[in-house]
């Protein structure tokens, strides 16, 4: 597992108050991890801060799963 993937999963677990074991790549923030719209906004902000990147609103709306978050952050770090 890459460091970005590990970091993204750790942030998701912390922000959503779930166990790290629950944060699997295909997990949906809302359906599987119990996030609401405020949780997802706070999650995006935490990812932006941790990885020193900006996630435009139209992209943030597409980030609905753990894998989507990992993919976006990996692309932004290249």
Curated annotation (Swiss-Prot):
The gene is acpP. It holds the Pfam family PP-binding. It is found in: Cytoplasm. Gene3D superfamilies: ACP-like. GO terms for molecular function: acyl binding; acyl carrier activity. Keywords: Cytoplasm, Fatty acid biosynthesis, Fatty acid metabolism, Lipid biosynthesis, Lipid metabolism, Phosphopantetheine, Phosphoprotein. This is Acyl carrier protein. 4'-phosphopantetheine is transferred from CoA to a specific serine of apo-ACP by AcpS. This modification is essential for activity because fatty acids are bound in thioester linkage to the sulfhydryl of the prosthetic group. Carrier of the growing fatty acid chain in fatty acid biosynthesis. SUPFAM superfamilies: ACP-like (SSF47336). GO terms for cellular component: cytosol; membrane. Belongs to the acyl carrier protein (ACP) family. Residues 2-77 form the Carrier domain. The modification O-(pantetheine 4'-phosphoryl)serine is found at residue 37. Pathway: Lipid metabolism; fatty acid biosynthesis. One of its GO terms (biological process) is lipid A biosynthetic process. InterPro entries: ACP, ACP-like_sf, PP-bd_ACP, Ppantetheine_attach_site.
């Amino acid at each position: 597992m890459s460091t970005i993937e590990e970091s993204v999963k750790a942030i998701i677990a912390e922000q959503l108050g779930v166990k790290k074991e629950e944060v699997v790549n295909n997990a949906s923030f809302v359906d599987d991890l119990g996030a609401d719209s405020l949780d997802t906004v706070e999650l995006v902000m935490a990812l932006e801060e941790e990885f020193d990147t900006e996630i435009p609103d139209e992209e943030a709306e597409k980030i609905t799963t753990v894998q989507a978050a990992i993919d976006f952050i990996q692309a932004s770090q290249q």
